């Protein structure tokens, strides 16, 4: 099933993101974790792509397994920043020839060895280049793109960011998923601005349950997310107690999702990080709301 078809339904839904193994030795444990999440029957599951393509060879394998063994629609991530055009075309064809109907088109983080290189030598400089390639090779694939309620780290300002986002959508993005955020008002303001700019495709908020203090530090470093005082206080109080922090983080994420549903959002994507217990707890917290 195409994700765009799921997103146009009136039913409230939750989906989860997982990541592939980094090595063959961890394949079985990662596969088991993703299958445990698939058994919860989310609306769909997305499978990430390693930085610089590092774990890319397992992305489609995990996505196909979830779909074939558990009947859960999947979204395979694809990045392009450090890849040749030949390699990317091959991977697009692999997805096209599988039963996976959805692809998340991302530029990807720039590897350290390319930070100071000449971008003119890259086959792909931006996600829009990848989106156009996918639409040319596999026009029937449903294509997702990323968006940033708090502005892309490389954009000069939000107006520039939204202008580029509109270009991505015009190039063929069927839906958008947001970077993590911890203050829902940032999302609501962002949605107003992009609708004013003529971006009409569905937007799925991305929610990251923070279950330990170190995870929060990494999240801030990666995304630059604003941390509201309410969440800072939570981490200050419970951050040194693993079980308390885990429970508090799950409840905070659940509260965010409930508020999103209450304010007209129908579909929320949870960055569950291969943690079946976290995914299950959030689903249990929302069971009556989702049903």
Show the residue positions of the predicted features.
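Short, acidic/polar
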Residues: 24-37, 59, 85-92, 157-167, ...
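Active-site/ligand-binding-proximal alpha/beta "capping" segment
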Residues: 133-175, 251-263
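Conserved, mostly hydrophobic/aromatic
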Residues: 17, 45, 95, 168, ...
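Active-site pocket-lining/capping segments in soluble small-molecule metabolic enzymes
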Residues: 121-122, 126-148, 198-250, 255, ...
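Active-site-adjacent beta->alpha loops and helix N-cap segments on the catalytic face
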Residues: 3-6, 25-27, 53-65, 84-90, ...
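Active-site beta-loop-alpha junctions enriched in small/polar residues
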Residues: 18-21, 48-52, 77-83, 108-109, ...
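Active-site mouth loops of central-metabolism enzymes
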Residues: 13-29, 74-86, 144-160, 237-251
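N-terminal amphipathic alpha-helix/helix-capping segment at the start of soluble metabolic enzymes
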Residues: 1-16, 23, 133-135, 232-233, ...
């Amino acid at each position: 099933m195409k994700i765009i078809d799921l997103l146009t339904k009136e039913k409230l839904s939750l989906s989860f993101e997982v990541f592939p193994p980094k090595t063959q030795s961890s394949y079985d444990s990662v596969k088991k974790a993703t299958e445990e999440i698939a058994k919860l029957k989310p609306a769909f599951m997305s499978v990430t792509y390693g930085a610089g393509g590092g774990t890319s060879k397992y992305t489609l394998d995990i996505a196909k397994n979830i779909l074939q063994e558990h009947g859960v629609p999947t979204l395979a991530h694809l990045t392009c920043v450090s890849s040749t055009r030949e390699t990317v075309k091959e991977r697009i064809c692999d997805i096209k020839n599988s039963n996976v109907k959805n692809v998340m088109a991302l530029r990807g983080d720039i590897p350290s060895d390319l930070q100071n290189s000449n971008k003119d030598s890259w086959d792909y400089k931006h996600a829009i280049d990848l989106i156009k390639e996918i639409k040319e090779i596999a026009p029937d694939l449903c294509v997702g793109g990323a968006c940033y309620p708090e502005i892309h780290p490389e954009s000069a300002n939000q107006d520039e960011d939204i202008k580029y986002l509109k270009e991505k959508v015009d190039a063929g993005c069927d839906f958008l998923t947001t970077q993590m955020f911890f203050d829902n008002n940032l999302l609501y303001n962002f949605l107003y601005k992009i609708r004013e700019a003529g971006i009409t495709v569905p937007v799925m908020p991305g929610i990251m349950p923070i279950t330990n203090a170190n995870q929060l530090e990494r999240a801030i470093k990666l995304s630059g997310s604003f941390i509201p005082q309410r969440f800072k206080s939570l981490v200050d109080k419970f951050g040194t107690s693993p079980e308390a922090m885990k429970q508090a983080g799950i409840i905070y994420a659940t509260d965010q999702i409930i508020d999103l549903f209450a304010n007209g959002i129908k579909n929320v994507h949870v960055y569950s990080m291969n943690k079946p217990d976290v995914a299950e707890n959030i689903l249990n917290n929302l069971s009556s709301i989702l049903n």
